[in-house]
Amino acid sequence: ASAATLLTGTTALSGLTTLGSMAASAASYDNYAKLLQYSMYFYDGNMCGSDVDTASQFSWRGSCHGSDEVDGGFHDAGDHVKFGLPAGYTASTLGWGYYEFKDSYDALGQTAHLQALTNRFCDFFKASTKLSGDTVTSFCYQVGVGQADHDVWCSPESQNDQSLRTAYWTSDDASDIAAEYAAALAVNYINFGNAEDLKYAKALYNYSIKTNKANCPEAANFYNSYDYYDDQAWAAGWLYLATNDSTYSSFLNKFMNDTNAGKSGQSGCKWGVYSTMCWNNVSLGAAILQSEITGDAMDWAKVTTYLNGKCTSESTYYCESDWGSARYNTALQMAALATTKYSAKSGMDYSSWCKAQMGMILGNNPKNVNFVVGMDSNSAKYPHHRAASGYQSFDEMKGKTDYSSNGHTL
């Protein structure tokens, strides 16, 4: 999504003729057109289900885990569990990128690929949800046993141990995950118009605000959400944009002006935003939606005050955490460039900072390494990814320092 924001930001500043120059050099630090295309291939590598052999754009990926209680969806990271919280966050953020910067996807012929990915996420969320009328009776928030799966090394196509594929359902918990599913479904409805997406989004949102709990140990051992309030506000923002129903904008407004503590002490955003976008906190995204909806200077000030404290140096890589640092960096870029899009109201333009940060990710760094796998000759190789590694067992991989000769470029 941040690739699309940068592409749009660059063309807005320099004119559409820059598209040709950006594609001219594979080693350039601003080849956002190629970056947008290549960044989405990760999801083709992570597809799960009985149709992967035809759905994935990678010929080396085959169908897998076809006996899962809930078929389809995507594996998490380089392993094979389907965790609900990061899946919902990912799908809603991909949808957000398209919502804000649709023209970039369209101009580059990438809309069909993006839509295939977000539809696949949403199809999985709907298949994970049991309805009675418009009411959620239960939903599946995880498929796969976290630690047991992490103790295995093999391709998904050869992982046949069904004892590792437990589906976890709840009828009165996981409010955070339900809200993330709802957000993803709502923005996908806005983007592509599937009425079933909106139906399920409303139902999952209502379930979330009714249950108000986030205490699922199977998920928390790997993705421990601090609260559910931010997820509900994020979903409410998208549902308002989808329906124009003031019930949703009222909830979002309450979150933006609330000080009441949530599950673990998280409050609303009355005093500002305090976290970069990530799977465990989407307050910044919710605050941007609120600001877009109201256009209010005080709402935008909460967003820009936070961003001004983070988007400071164009020569130092922004590192929120050294574990998966680029996810925080690019998520912050996404928020910053969405804010830049509305500069007439927000009063800020962060495009120069974002271009500098993305340049570092694309190789303008002391190591001269492009951290987007497969994009350039100097791209990072051998990520932690079981499907791509070429090794079929831990014993086969043990002691090796590179991918198998049967490995693939992710």
Model-identified regions with their sequence ranges:
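Internal metal/ion-chelating core segments
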Residues: 182-184, 196-240
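Carboxylate/His-rich catalytic cores and anion/metal-binding grooves
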Residues: 117-132
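Aromatic (Trp/Tyr) and acidic
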Residues: 27-97, 140-191, 229-254, 277-313, ...
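Active-site-adjacent structural elements in folded domains
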Residues: 166-169, 216-223, 268-274, 315-321
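Short, surface-exposed loop/turn segments at secondary-structure junctions
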Residues: 29-30, 77, 103-115, 194-195, ...
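Solenoid-like repeat scaffolds
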Residues: 257-262, 269-276
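Sec-dependent signal peptide cleavage junction
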Residues: 3-4, 9-27
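Short coil/linker segments at helix-helix boundaries
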Residues: 99-117, 161-169, 187-200
